[in-house]
Amino acid sequence: TVARNAAGEDPSDSLVLDGSIGLDLQWVKVDGKLLASSDYLREAESLTIFNLPDQCVVSTEVFIKPHLNTTMMGLYRSRTMYCTQCEAEGFRDITYYLDRPDVMAEFTTTVVGDLQQYPILLSNGNPIDRGIIDGDRHFVTWHDPFKKPAYLFALVAGTLSVVNDSFVTSSGREVHLQIFVEEKDLDKCDHAMLSLKRSMRWDEEVYGREYDLDIFMIVAVDDFNMGAMENKGLNIFNTSAVLVNSKTSTDAAFQRVEAIVAHEYFHNWSGNRVTCRDWFQLSLKEGFTVFRDSQFSSDMNSPTVKRIEDVNILRTHQFAEDGGPMAHSVQPESYMEINNFYTVTIYEKGAEVVGMYHTLLGGENFRKGSDLYFDRHDGQAATVEDFVVAMEDASNRDLSQFRRWYKQSGTPVLTVTSSFDKQAATYTLNFKQYCPDTPGQTGKLPFVIPVRLGLVGAEGEDLVLNSEGHTQVIFEVTEVEQSLVIDNIAVEPVPSLLRGLSAPVKLDYQYSDEQLAHLMAYDTDGFNRWDAAQTLSLTTLQQLAEDSFEGLELTLNGNLIDAFARLLKDESLDPAMVALMLQLPGEALMHQLADTIHPAAIHDARNFVRVALAGALKDNLLDIYNRFNTPIDYRPEADQIGRRSLKNAALGYLMLVGDTGAELAWLQYQQADNMTDKAAALSALVNSPAAADYATQALKTFEQQYRDEALVMNLWLQIQAINSQSGGLSRVEALMEHSAFTMNNPNKVRSLIGGFCSANLVNFHSADGAGYRFLCDQILSLNKTNPQVAARLVTPLTRWKEFAEPHSQLMRSELQKIADEPGLVKDIYEIATKSL
């Protein structure tokens, strides 16, 4: 049923419905009357119906061919089932409709299928009717009482097994929980179900949000472009985001499942009950929900470790996006293809912006603001401005300047200098902010930057910063230049700045090596302790990369060795923290920070430091490995995960010196009773020139053991794809012929091709340009079958201007080839042309 919007200014009596070229229109009816072909106009992407009354019922019938749909948008086939993906604009590939997020309707869906072939028929909401048709067919009717836009529609039909459970809400309602999987995967659902129940309870306790339907369903799909989709009451998940057990999944996979299950469940309120008015408001639901799932993961595990993981993603990927040709604001003003704006800026930077509300307003006011937002806009398609106003009204604070975080693109740089006046016993911090120009934006205005900070004394103590006795404060930088004077400081301290990365900015403070080592040893903020280790390592790596490019002999500064030695001996630290502090900054981050990128020099410098540290600290590393390499019943919980991560970090270093590491890794591979340890050992062997025989044997036995486990074989592909030894491209091309790989499965494409091009940088960026030509060929191949996956693969080529020759022109040449391809879809065209 459609009705004219009385507020609309267009006097036309025509209705334009979104559609696609794949819809085979059979008929159109208005109020039950069959229309003549002259009463409507069908075009490639729309259906216009003429001369409609102000209110009427419009009916259409279309034929579609989902079994031929390789884009995995709309309705398509995956192995034994049919399923859907409608966000952002997939519903128009199923039927004609007003396919935009502000058009919300109550859906009743009847699914009909062969009883033997498709015994499971699912859609949104609650089942209200079912029955048999002609003996061999059946139907199920689903009703979703909550109005929703078409992007939240879902349908599944297939032969599936189910894991059942239940949850009692805070008001006493019992909700039926179901996870549908292929029968062979029934033993991999327990963790997802536990994560779902924890998420439901947490959202009640922390945000006051109770589930609203009688049933909540998750379906695991092997062929899926995304991680998961929050369709109302019927979440559809990539198998990699829901299926885990200790024999087939790593600790990281367990944590990923927990986070994604939570994220999609939290969308029931921040995305479904309150959706977004248009796709320019995408971060309204995604940034808020990423922040919520990060809070949840922090509460379930280690808050410090979770924050470090989030910041690593932000600095490596989002800061790079901010500094490249695809830079855009959290609330972009235009796009060519909406699928290209499901980005780290919208999601991760959007979450950082929400986190700054929490920091600036405090937890209590933030909760008041979120409650007000949900209460005001329940059942509506809202805007970013609605969210900001709710926070303003709840906290009685003017957030006018804060809104710049939504409109201005780029990563602000916060430069800090300090001075100490011993006679006056004052310590002064001077702050200066600026934001570099980005495509289409110059002359940025000052942001509101909350700087959480402390001062660490000469003996490692936290110094008092104000008359209230606080040892940590939040200083708001709102001007281009500002200063903070702290009294009663007798001895010059070391500043601990931007604790927890309290704002998504780049910090420029000229720490000495000694100051960084001091923070590594004494800072009571765990994040900044790790960050000091990263900064100390990064300073060393950047200098060595420069030396390597200049052809100079490489030598390692003793300060880094000493700092790492102290770290390995500090038994007071959480093992997970030590493991993270042992990880050197990655090559991708070094690429992002370099003025001109020399891939081989960066790789050689990082490898040199790893080898030098391993040689100098071999005994300490061996002690760590032996201490944590003890038999224990597997649990995917924070304490055990930390122990395994530290043990395997030590093993990675030990592989670089002598034969000890190779023998330990081979023994660990053979004896491991969990996939975390087995995969870590396999990766260590594969990346070691000294362990070639062991690696060959391990890869062979791994394949034999797990050849029927698709997700495990994806890991097998990925480990080989990111092997940084020479010959990487040849190995990848050979693996593309392996039975474990197919271009038709996005997970496999991401594991092998994506892994090679994004995480094996020294091989991808070979000076002959073979890696670039290879990637171009794969993108153009996928252009014909799955443009959304293809578009994601373009990213490694987009920053060609920052590379030294011959890389720069070789990358540009392949980008130009992509842009010139006849029949190129707009997903890829937009990224390629903007990058050129």
Question: Where in the sequence are the language-model features?
Answer:
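Long, ordered, helix-rich scaffold segments
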Residues: 316, 487-836
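Long hydrophobic segments that form regular secondary structure
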Residues: 341-375, 408-445, 500-526, 531-542, ...
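Hydrophobic alpha-helical and helix-loop surface patches within well-folded domains
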Residues: 31-33, 89, 142, 171-423, ...
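Surface-exposed beta-strand/loop patches in extracellular or lumenal glycoproteins
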Residues: 3-23, 96-99, 105-114, 385, ...
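Short, hydrophobic/aromatic-enriched beta-strand segments in well-ordered soluble domains
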Residues: 1-4, 19, 52-69, 107-115, ...
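A surface-exposed beta-strand-loop module
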Residues: 12-14, 20-78, 134, 477-493
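Beta-strand-rich binding/interaction modules
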Residues: 21-30, 398-401, 411-497, 542, ...
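Extended, low-hydrophobicity, Ser/Thr/Pro/Gly-biased non-transmembrane segments
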Residues: 61-164, 525-530
